[in-house]
Amino acid sequence: MLPLTLSDLEGLPLGCSIVGSRCSRQQLQAHLEPWCQGDSSFDLLLLLAATRTAEREGISAAGATAASRRLTALADADLLLHGPGKPRRWPLPPLPAGVSPALLSHVALQRLPMQPLVAALGLEHEATFPHLRLESPQAGPARCLSTGRAMDPERVERLWRKGMRLGAQLRRPLLLAECVPGGTTTAQAVLKALGVPVNGLISGSARQPPQELKRHLVEQGLCRAQLPAWPSPQAVLAAVGDPFQAVAAGVLVSAQQPVLLGGGSQMAAVATLALASLPDQERKVLADRVLLGSTAWLALEWIRGGDMPALGCLLDEVGHRFGVSLAGLASGLRFHASRQPALRDYEDGFVKEGVGAGALLLLAQLQGQHSEALVEGCERALDQLLASAVASEV
């Protein structure tokens, strides 16, 4: 099976779609070139982080309860690294419907020339798998963004610097992924604080994102923070951000290689932080090496009326704010005809994205994997996951 070549890009892999409207097809072609090389290897950096924002009732579906959401990042990373058929230390939290996107990420990862690197930030439990420790476990989760003082400024500066060092050390094309329950709400706060119109553009893991609750928490946090009219990215992070955003923005600023951002609004917030930290003349340079990759379920979601789905509108708003064109693509994987009900739940608006699933699936397609084979791989992986769950109960 051969990777996609540049001559094929006029017709993207089956089902893949362009996200946003500010990036020309020629620009998109340039963005895709490093990800279509069949003889290339890539780096995957998965950042796990925690914020007390996730403990607000109804804010996130990345775990059915606040207690279970404290383990979501560890459980998802465990599944990504070890797969569904092997014993894992961290059980997956119960979900309202569907299955963890880490399962999809694992299936794609098995078909790609990359080794994952995991970093843990502010988790309440120590990871039992190999990982980068970028700060002491005693640092704990970020405070709820509604406090207006989510992190101490010293912590933000320290994490940003560590992200910059990490970004400078990684040399191959980099896929950046995250698992941060509550992270779409901190993303909404960061984007709004940095001047990006976000009303009706931020999704979440729930089938019906709690828009009013998110808006209330964001307004409460920004009111209490009393930020100046043109705050620095670091000041915004200290007020309403989370540890993932600080490290990821630092990585993005210092990385000189192509970067594939795996996700939706959380990665849009990271791109916004990075762009806001740079002088005007350097912003286009950064935008030209960044591509956002998402799932079709997130990229095609309409939250408000408009000319295009919410994620595309959000990318365009970020680009307009900083005078650049941000490129985005959605993977072509769909589960309409899957034999697995938990996978078909994705088509009904549950889960949608996470743990870099969209970017990993997109990269697998760009490297020549057919969507039918990826669907079958996800179905087999879910068979294994369900069988292992039954075995553990016996």
Swiss-Prot record:
SUPFAM superfamilies: Nicotinate mononucleotide:5,6-dimethylbenzimidazole phosphoribosyltransferase (CobT). InterPro entries: Nict_dMeBzImd_PRibTrfase (IPR003200), Nict_dMeBzImd_PRibTrfase_arc (IPR002805), Nict_dMeBzImd_PRibTrfase_sf (IPR036087). GO terms for molecular function: nicotinate-nucleotide-dimethylbenzimidazole phosphoribosyltransferase activity. CDD domains: DMB-PRT_CobT (cd02439). This is UPF0284 protein SYNW1869. Belongs to the UPF0284 family. It comes from the Bacteria. Signal peptide: none annotated.
